[in-house]
Amino acid sequence: GSYDAMPKGDFEGLSSLKLKDDAVLEVTMSDPQSYYLRGYTGSVYNKHGWETTDKKVLYNASDLFYWLHQDGFFGQETLPLASLALDETTKEEPENTVTIKNLKEDSRYLYTPYELTGTTPDKNRIGDEGVIAKGLKGQRKYTYTALENQIKKYPSLTAKLADTENLDEEGKAYSEKEAFYNQYVYETNLELPESVETELKEILGEYTLANGSTHFDYTKAKQNILYVLSSRCTYSEGIKKETGDLDFLTN
């Protein structure tokens, strides 16, 4: 693995990717399968990387997150919560016990999948940005439980969530909480620097929201993302270092 290519969201001084043979994490599971593990999670993109949400913004959202957390809703667990509320078959699936031994990565963060269920995040932490390890030095070894891989269910779950007329009581309860969290994410975590917005408008043009919608259609948004990646981006493990006040995305 490589353990120095992405220094916690800071793109300034970022070097080219050089993969190493050293193990970074040791992962064991009761039911081995594929997961995407998250460690450091940035919240707001600036020209030079990711940063945490402004304290004033978090303070203003404190009542919202108090209510969500008291009701068992955490942003780090939206996928398993959605699957359990919207798909009856999920409740019949066995949970997977996962043990992480952190050999060389930052021990301040727990490395967890989107399907995380066995580690209750801090109820007093506003913003739900990743899962922070306990202790001054973090944690090098820990165990949690997770649902089976749920990423593959994402299209069907979003379709069920959108079909509001056919949601049962459990689905409606999840939908209500998700809507409040969704609004916070859109207002807080999806802001882009003006330079990026300008370039994207040149590529994709202007857009308008459909009547009654609070955000752009997910299917069309995905198509736009794939279009930009395939037509305007070239994969490279070499990094051109930033100079001056250039934006990492547009440089």
Could you say what each language-model-derived stretch is?
Residues 1-251:
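Helix-boundary/low-complexity linker signature
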